[in-house]
Amino acid sequence: MNRLKKRTCQFLVLVTTAGLLTGCGGGTPKLEDALKKTAAYEQETVTSPASDTLGGEWTVIALARSGETVDENYFEKYRANLEKRVKDQEGVLSDNRYTEYSRAVMALKSIGKDPTDIGGYDIEKPLEDFDAVVSQGLNGAIYALIALNADDPDANKDGELEQKYLDYILEREKADGGFSLDDNAKDGDVDLTAMTLQSLEPYQDEEDVKEVIDKGVEFLAEIQDDDGGYTAFGAKSSESISQTVIALSAVGVDCNEDERFQKDGKGLYDTLMTFYQKDGSFKHTLDGESNPMATDQGFCALVAYQRYQDKENSFFDMTDYR
């Protein structure tokens, strides 16, 4: 091989290698690499996961569902922190936000712990108070249904309470096929529609529910912006994309390959990764900085899509908890 050919080959190897690297100018990061980096980032920044929206349950759930290596004491730290909160508050996580219970139940089920005995308190029982749960609106019903079904959807989904939440959710479908937190709103919004589809996953073999899911997917495709993102309440954010990726992965739609969600040759995963930072975190907006909520939701989306690609149980089907 002459020197010119050798140098040309070396150059091509360098270019190819650079294309595989994550970060600015390296193209869309590979899913597996991004997931590993975000898992490491979460453990470095959330060292003692609490019972809370940020730095708490969503971090635990995503790590547990990711299959990535986690410090052996990490999940026990969360359980202990939750137990302390439960005892300090005499079993009451909230008087009016029952998603506090749903989130904790999901986290416990994701790590194989029993939510009916945390420091002597049953934190799943409050979800039996249907009126209190739905006083929070559609959001409350969605996450109660996900939490109740999470450990064994096939066994739990037809229960009287689960069916009551299911009916409540289905009754709130908008004419455009979407869902909204505002019962009086004419149109659906991206985030609540995506969350609704996540809760309906165990029922997608039922014809009437499948029809609602299909309409919801079409709604999410139709309201997508020309640049591949979503605008919710006047703002573009990574969280809306993350929720949609989780939803599509749950109902068997490839968020990056399905033509309905492609814009200028890019799919939803590609668009989500424009918010991704080199350290594994996510930004809330493109011109913003790393954001804890955006990172938690982005991580959940990466895990959900990876599980879809690997043909594993979906993000919220925790019968295979690991």
Regions found by a protein language model. Give the residues of each.
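Preference for long, amphipathic alpha-helical scaffolds in soluble/luminal domains
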Residues: N2-K5, T22-R322
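Sec-dependent signal peptide recognition
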Residues: K6-L14
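Hydrophobic core
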Residues: T16-L21
